[in-house]
């Protein structure tokens, strides 16, 4: 389920992002449009994505998703519509790869957080997921690859 859990330091990034707060059962309705909106604005402003898109979950809440849909970019973007610019600082994180359908992410996060705790590490309240292989690449959910990142205190 989880591949290669380890601790690493991320690089600082410029991002274009759309903040989203939605009930958990509506995530499938809002995720795609949010990412499409970010990519459209990035391209409209003549910027280029410089890596996979990701979601920065600001907090974990059983009732809602409170996150930012982010695209790393080569140059800053101007705020337009719901899209805002952001800086993603270099951060020490615990990281692992989950391979499988998105429906298994909750269980994967549980196993990953248990690994983090077993290492004597303390995670912050936020977390993020980078989508390395998803529905834009294959219709086979067992082939999806999601990078799990737990920023550390």
What are these regions (language model features)?
Residues 1-153:
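A solvent-exposed interaction/effector surface
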């Amino acid at each position: 389920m989880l591949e290669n859990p380890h601790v690493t330091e991320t690089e600082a990034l410029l991002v274009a992002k759309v903040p989203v707060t939605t009930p958990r059962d509506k995530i499938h309705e809002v995720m795609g449009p949010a990412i499409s909106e970010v990519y459209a604005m990035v391209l409209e402003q003549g910027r280029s994505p410089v890596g996979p898109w990701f979601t920065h979950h600001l907090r974990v809440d059983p009732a809602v998703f409170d996150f930012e849909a982010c695209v790393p970019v080569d140059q800053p973007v101007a705020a337009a519509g719901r899209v805002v610019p952001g800086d993603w600082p270099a951060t020490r994180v615990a990281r692992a790869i989950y391979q499988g359908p998105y429906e298994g992410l909750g269980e994967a996060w549980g196993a990953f957080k248990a690994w983090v705790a077993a290492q004597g590490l303390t995670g912050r309240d936020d977390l993020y997921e980078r989508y390395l292989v998803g529905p834009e690449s294959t219709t086979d959910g067992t082939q999806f690859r999601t990078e799990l990142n737990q920023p550390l205190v």
